[in-house]
Regions:
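Beta-rich catalytic cores
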Residues: 31
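Short, charged, amphipathic alpha-helix that recurs within catalytic cores of restriction-modification
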Residues: 52-79
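Acidic-basic catalytic patches of nuclease active cores, encompassing PD-(D/E)XK
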Residues: 1-26, 40
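Histidine- and/or cysteine-centered catalytic micro-motif in compact active-site loops
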Residues: 24-27, 50-52
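Structural signal for conserved beta-strand scaffold positions within catalytic alpha/beta enzyme cores
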Residues: 23, 48, 76-78
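Conserved catalytic cores of phosphodiester-cleaving nucleases, focusing on short active-site segments
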Residues: 35-37, 43-53
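Helix-rich interaction surfaces within compact, conserved domain-sized segments
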Residues: 93-111
Length: 111
């Protein structure tokens, strides 16, 4: 899955040149999202990248805890391989995402 997420990151970075991205190495702090973004409106936010080959989205307990503690300005972006789509959820949806998987209504539209 690591190779899939690395490829997803490269594609995502190319498709979002208007955002300044910093890739975060997670060996320092477990659960910290993969990306720190900064947009043209002057806002920082984090994104956890996931590649799902089924309805289930796999998140570690540390990743879940991060989004529970930081429900705002945090996102989980899932590449749904089976249905060829991107699904973005806001951090506060993390528990629902675990319970419902990709059948959960997407939290952000237009990506």
């Amino acid at each position: 899955m690591i190779k899939d997420e690395s490829k997803f990151w490269r594609e995502f970075k190319e498709d979002t040149p208007e955002i300044s991205w910093t890739r975060i190495e997670n060996s320092v702090s477990l659960g910290t999202p993969d990306l720190l973004g900064y947009n043209n409106n002057g806002y920082f936010f984090t994104v956890e990248l996931k590649v799902a080959k089924s309805n289930k989205v796999r998140l570690s307990p540390h990743q879940i805890a991060f989004h529970v503690r930081h429900p705002m300005s945090t996102f989980i972006l899932v590449k749904d391989v089976k249905n060829s789509r991107l699904c973005m959820y806001v951090g506060r949806q993390v528990k629902d995402l675990l319970a419902c998987g990709l059948s959960l209504v997407v939290g952000i539209f237009g990506i």
